Amino acid sequence: MANLKSLAKDTAIYGLSSIVGRFLNYLLVPLYTARLAASSGGYGVITEVYSYTALLLVLLTFGMETTFFRFVNKEGGRDPMRVYSTTLIAVGGVGVAFVALVLGFLPQIAAALDYADHPEYVGTMAVCVAIDAFQCIPFAYLRYRRRPIKFAALKLLFIGLNIGLNLVYFLLLPALYARPAWHDVVACVYDPSVGVGYAFFINLACTALVTFFFRRELTGFRYVFDRRLMARMWHYAWPILILGIAGILNQTADKMIFPRIVEGPEGKVQLGIYGACVKIAMIMAMITQAFRYAYEPFVFGKDREGDNRDTYARAMKYFVIFTLLAFLIVVGYLDVIKHIIAPGYWDGLRVVPIVMAAEILMGIYFNLSFWYKLIDRTIWGAWFSGAGCVVLVAVNVAFIPTYGYMACAWAGVAGYATAMLLSYFVGRRYYPIRYPLRSIGVYVLLAAAFFAVMQWLPAAWPLWARLGVNTVLIGLFAAHAVHYDFPLRAWPVVGRYFRKRS
């Protein structure tokens, strides 16, 4: 239990940067959807470009984040800084080569991506993602050194700067530009024709600035590139790279494929609607990411202490409970939450429960995936994620022409379910863990039943009545969890009032 409390503490701190940070980032969703009309397709451009940058981030880190944790725990007792410096040099060198390649062939690459009129979008995000990839290693080092406070502070610094500058360039400066008294002054730093491009330029500026705060993590030691160590690390990392590519394609392939099937301005419009509504569903991604930040170093660290399979099983159960609770909360209050995006985008709200379900499956798959990392058989992850990716792409290609972006949402469910089931059944043979499936199944059925009731409530009911019923259902789910798995007597502070007196 002490191990799980340590995990919960780190998850809470990392979650501050992930959950609170992404929540603050939601300020950009109403901002973009308000300033970029759905019919303009501007938010579709943002959605598509960021889907490519997500894939590039995986390619440029090429599995070295997880590999760093494995090797710094496995061999770092002798010389952890050798592992760290080798990783930094490798990722940094690949990033520099990538930027040089993109800038050297910028017109051709921009034309291939249908951005021939705006090659600056491509060039800006290429530099941005290279810096971001390099920063992943110092961030990983902070996690290794158990310094979640600085980790969270830097993540929140980036988000705060990003939000602030976006508010300036998409809200304040356009308003001042329209006033004759301010027009000439504002014109020195603002050009309305740049439009959506400011989102990318601001991202680059904020990313570059954060790098300067890694001075202590990037100085004070001798940089050494150990070729033999790098060869062993690459042998461990390349299956993780394939796993990462397949995994990120599971998250972004729909946004890359959609404008290729639904061509022209209409494709960008529909992609923008889908992308805006997916942002609402990303609360599940926040929880999964916060859990991952704490769970990865936790698992590799505990592996050195012996067999902790019971701990992993309980962690899985708690993850499922909290993600299902988050699912019910978002769906139950969707009529309120939807106001973070402009009404012109509300047609896509029906994808929210589906995308959230897909994110839960992805989180379960992530939890299941540690068995092959712990036994150094990461190639299995590549096969599982690859199979899921094939299913996702096939569903998208087959059904987007008929069902539009609804096919994108269901494709995510199909892809993650495939990878999850493969990992579970193969893992039972190589690294069996006795997960409390019966208890987990009860929570899943309970959440499914409550979700069905929420969906079947008459639309003619007043908002307060629907929200009232949904609140009761959410409370019943939480009460079940408290009664069976989180008894009040075990809670800090309040627990003493519920313990039996002898």
Predicted regions, residues:
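Membrane-proximal transmembrane or re-entrant/amphipathic helices at the cytosolic face
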Residues: 455-502
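Signature of the first transmembrane helix
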Residues: 3-66, 95-103, 128, 163, ...
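Membrane-water interface segments that mark the loop-to-transmembrane alpha-helix transition
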Residues: 9-21, 49, 58-107, 116, ...
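Interfacial/gating helices of multi-pass transporter permease domains
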Residues: 29-54, 119-120, 192-198, 232-236, ...
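Specific pore-lining/lateral-gate transmembrane helices of multi-pass inner-membrane transport
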Residues: 73-90, 273-385
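Hydrophobic alpha-helical transmembrane segments
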Residues: 123, 152-218, 386-391, 405-426, ...
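Transmembrane helical elements of multi-pass membrane transporters/channels
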Residues: 10-25, 199-214, 218, 227-300, ...
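Interhelical loop/hinge segments that connect adjacent transmembrane helices in multipass membrane
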Residues: 1-7, 177-198, 208-251, 294, ...
